[in-house]
Amino acid sequence: MTKMGGNLAVMLLSLFLSALATGNGNSIPTTTTPQGVFETRTDKLPGGAASVPSGAGIYDDIDTFVPFRSDSHDPFSWHLLKTVLQNETADKNVIISPFSVKLVLALLAEAAGAGTQTQVELANTQTDIRSQNNVREFYRKTLNSFKKENQLHETLSVRTKLFTDSFIETQQKFTATLKHFYDSEVEALDFTNPEAAADAINAWAANITQGRLQQLVAPDNVRSSVMLLTNLIYFNGLWRRQFATTFQGSFFRSKDDQSRAEFMEQTDYFYYTTSEKLKAQILRLPYKGKNSLFVLLPYALNGIHDLVKNLENDELKSAQWAMEEVKVKVTLPKFHFDYQQNLKETLRSLGVREIFEDSASLPGLTRGADVAGKVKVSNILQKAGINVNEKGTEAYAATVVEIENKFGGSTAIEEFNVNRPFVFFIEEESTGNILFAGKVHSPTTQN
C-alpha cells in the first residue's frame, strides 16, 4: 500500500459457498433499529456567514458530536473484535471490519430457510437493529447514507458482489433483494478457469480500493467454490484538525521492549474521557464528515491485555456518552499495516455454526436440480489494512465468503500520549456502525 495524504482503511470480506440440504423460505426476521443522531449547528458560521440548516453538509466547519443513540450499540461487533484479539498472538497488529462481516451475514440470512437454525443464528448477529425499520431497510438507508457521505467527502466506499460459477442460477428473488436493499450485484464467471476468474475478481477489488488490495482471492479459492460473496470497504478520511508536528520517539511494546517510532502531536479541544472499568483513557479524533477514530489507551504500560479482556459494548457506549470536550495534548504514532484472517472458527465460537455444516439451510441462494438447497459456507476470509498519518487515515477491508458444493470543557490540558499498545475503532457516527476496529502492538510493524 502506498503512502497517501490521508487516513486510509480498506476491508475485504470473502465468503466461499458449497451445496447442501433443502429448506423453506428466504427472508430474515423483521427487526428494527433506532435512528442515529449526528447534529450540525444552525447558528452563524465564522465570519458572519448565514446560518446553514441541519444536514446541509457543513461538517468541515463545525463538529457537534452526539453519541449514536442506541440501546444496544452493536454487541456483536464488539464480541467479534474481542474474540479475534484474544485468539491472536499478543505481538500482532490487528484490524478487522465488523460492519463488513455483519453485512455479508445479513445477505446470507436473506437466503436462509424460514424458521431454521441457520436463520436464527444469522439473525442473532443483527440484534442491535431494533426500530420501525427492518434489517433490509436498515442496510438500504445505511448504504445510501454512505453514498451521500462519499459524494461530499469521497471518504467511504462500500461495494458488495456475488460472483458465481457460470453454471449456477441464483434465485431471482434473492438477486432482486440484494440489488434493491443491499446495493449488491451478481456476476457469473467461468470457475472452470480459476486463474482467469480470480484475475477478474482481483481487478474489481483493486479498482474499488484504488490499488490497495491487489489479491483478494487466489485460483484455489475459486477452484473449490461455486460462489464467492465479496464485500469491500474503502475509507480515506482527512482529520478535521490535522497534525502539524511530527517527531521521533519511543514506543513501549512492553516494559523491556521499546522501539523508535514516528509520532504526531497537537494540542486542541477534543472529546475525551476515562474508564475505570477499562482502566483506559478514551479519545475521539474526528475526520471531516461523519466518521471518527476512537483511541483506547490503557493506563498501564502493560495494560493492553486487561483492556481487551474487559472490552464490553455497554461500557464503551457509557464511555462515549460521558465524553466531554476538553483541551488535550495528543501524541499519536503513525501506523501502517495489513492483516488477514479466516473468521470461520471465530464465528463458530460466537454461535454462527450452521452455515458451515452440511445441515445448513440456504435455499434462497440458488435454483436448479444440481445445487438448489445444496450449498454451505466453507470459509469467511477477511483482509484489511490501515494507514494513519498526520493528514488523516486510509483504511480498507474486504470479506470473502466461499460457498462450495456440499458434495464437493476544562481549562486544564489532558495528556494523551499513545506510546504503548492500544485499541482503536472507526465509527460512522450517524448510524453507529463500527467500520474498522483493531489493536496496535507495534506502529512500525506492517505484519
Swiss-Prot record:
Glycan-linked positions: N87, N207
Assigned GO CC terms: extracellular region; extracellular space; perivitelline space
What is the scientific name of the source organism?
A: Drosophila melanogaster (Fruit fly)
Record's keyword annotation contains Cell wall biogenesis/degradation = no
Primary residence = secreted
Q: Which SMART domains match?
A: SERPIN
Task: Summarize the record's disruption phenotype note.
Answer: Loss of maternal expression causes arrest prior to the syncytial blastoderm stage. A percentage of larvae and adults, 40% and 35% respectively, display spontaneous melanization. Melanization occurs mainly around the internal organs such as the gut and fat body, but is not associated with the barrier epithelia of the body wall. Increased melanization following wounding coupled with bacterial infection. Phenoloxidase (PO) activity is increased in the hemolymph, both in mutants that display melanization or those that do not. RNAi-mediated knockdown results in spontaneous melanization.
Q: Which InterPro entries match?
A: Serpin_CS (IPR023795), Serpin_dom (IPR023796), Serpin_fam (IPR000215), Serpin_sf (IPR036186), Serpin_sf_1 (IPR042178), Serpin_sf_2 (IPR042185)
CDD domains linked:
serpinK_insect_SRPN2-like
The conditions that induce or repress this protein are given as:
In adults, up-regulated between 0 and 3 hours after bacterial infection and fungal infection. Then appears to be down-regulated in the hemolymph between 3 and 17 hours after bacterial infection.
Q: Which GO terms describe its molecular function?
A: serine-type endopeptidase inhibitor activity
| Protein name (Swiss-Prot/TrEMBL) | Serine protease inhibitor 27A
UniProt cross-references to SUPFAM superfamilies, sorted A to Z: Serpins
Which BP terms from GO are recorded? behavioral response to ethanol; defense response to fungus; defense response to insect; dorsal/ventral pattern formation; melanization defense response; melanotic encapsulation of foreign target; negative regulation melanotic encapsulation of foreign target; negative regulation of melanization defense response
Which of UniProt's keywords are assigned here?
Answer: Glycoprotein, Protease inhibitor, Secreted, Serine protease inhibitor, Signal
Pinpoint the site Reactive bond: K406, F407
- Tell me where it resides: Secreted
* Range of residues in the leader sequence: 1-25
Family assignment from sequence similarity: Belongs to the serpin family.
Q: Sorted alphabetically, which Pfam families does this protein's record hold?
A: Serpin (PF00079)
Provide the assembly information.
Interacts with Sp7. Interacts with ea/easter; the two proteins are covalently linked leading to inhibition of ea catalytic activity.
Taxonomically, which superkingdom? Eukaryota
Primary role: Serine protease inhibitor that functions in embryonic dorsoventral patterning and the melanization immune response. Regulates dorsoventral axis formation during early development by inhibiting the serine protease ea/easter, and is therefore important for restricting activity of the Toll signaling pathway to the ventral part of the embryo. Also plays an essential role in the melanization immune response to both physical wounding and septic infection using certain bacteria and fungi.
